[in-house]
Amino acid sequence: MEATCPPILLQMIYMIMAGYFEDDASDELTKDSVFKAVLEKSALASQPTVSRFFNRMDEDTLKQFQEISQILRKRIYSIQMPQAVILDLDSTLLAAYGKQEGRAFNFHYRSNGYHPLVCYDGITGDLIKIQLRDGAAYSCTGVTDFLQPILDEYLNDYPTIHLLLRGDSGFATPDLYKQCEENGTSYVIWLMENFIKESKSGFDFSAVSSHNRIVNANRVQVHALAYNIFNWFRRLVLSAKMRKQRIDTVRLKLLKIATKVVHSARYITFKLCSSCPYKEEFYDPLSAIGKLNVQLE
């Protein structure tokens, strides 16, 4: 089957959001009626096609993922501009069990894997940036280079947003303090919101199964993109009650439910079971999506 890159990327984002994290799941879903209808394809890209898609990725695609993140953030902010953003700096261990490039023993976590830097918005939970690092890296290794593009983006594109940087003691370095002061950013070294748990368990950021380090870095970006799209969906269109629920609960109520796909001459209709207990939760977001005013340019 011939497949170009954008449809495969979209397929992987939908799969990750639905809880299918591995390339192999593509073969199981290839004839799934809902996936085929949403992607407008007669069949999904197969596991070998998906794996080749990832293996073609390089440093340039990493930069493109950052550009995609910035473009989407601008569109989300056109709907709901924040008054303040808390830049939550953190690091975590992505466990790796093979012979991946950059896999190493981390003495803090006492395990092998990668040790990425992450930056979330501590108010909304948006993942602003994630960067894969070798497993043996210290928490603060490369933090100023990691942070500067974020500060540049907010200071140039969103000058009215008040920035506060927050991190734990692992980031207590004079270089970071100086960087914040030179960029007019308040900072505090303290405990922070923990959004990493849902990122790792709900979106499997640890799916770093390729041997090549750059390929794994790109894989993480795809999972990060899926996380952010879900987080924006949760924040902008779910009800206040549903907004507090984690991805596993939302999957159970809105995604992993029985439906009948009906094809007509002009439309594809998804019919819910008459006894579906979450009909209201399902239809409310559809109505809210129709009311969004997104600035596309």
Which ranges hold each PLM region?
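Anion-binding and metal-coordination hotspots
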Residues: 1-297
